[in-house]
Amino acid sequence: IHMRIMKDGKNQMLKDGVLSETARKAIAGMMELAPSITAFGNTNPTSYFRLVPHQEAPTNICWGDRNRSVLVRVPLGWSAKTDMCMLANPLEAPSNYDTTQKQTVEMRSPDGSADLYQLIAGLAVACRRGFEMPDALEVADRTYVNVNIHKKENEDKLKQLAQLPDSCAASADCLEKQRAAFEKYNVFSPAMIDGIITKLRSYEDKTLRSEVQNSPEEMLKLMEKYFHCG
């Protein structure tokens, strides 16, 4: 999910050519609520076979620029104000389009099982949470990484980072702990949160990943049962 924060028709993600405080506060909120956002974006057991270390999918709660080992990625360099279309097509006239309006950040954990309505509402709640956190900028600084965290030389940094849940059962536990943030201002009703938690726990998959990791036959059965989205 790529997102940007708009105000009066203007993108608020950049200021003076760098990521703005507004953007970094929103990212901090996503860092804090990332564990429970999986309850909306990773909703069946096969989701957690994707969220494993050393793959393209994220497992650690961190963010960075153009870095595919992070959970929240800041893509491209829209702050450069370069008309890439004109560079690729030199006979075309420059568009004079303000490319800084395109700057987004990407939440990389959700997959095809996501309930999009709940997910987008949850991400909006997380961004709002970041605006309300007095230490949001410190959280953003602490969770920023500019290296591949899966390389051996960066293992000390990796150890400092929290991890995403590894099952629907763990995701349900995270949502239960953080539910107050989503119920605030009546964005999510308590009954809806209860229903999501109950559904996630119904899979009883707390140890499923380790149980089937060496069994291609069981893995295939799970894929056929749950991999029906997207």
Regions found by a protein language model. Name each.
Residues 1-8:
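Histidine-centered divalent-metal-coordination microenvironment in nucleic-acid enzymes
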Residues 7, 15-230:
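C-terminal accessory/tail domains of diverse enzymes
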Residues 11:
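Active-site-proximal loop/hinge segments that shape catalytic or ion-binding/gating pockets
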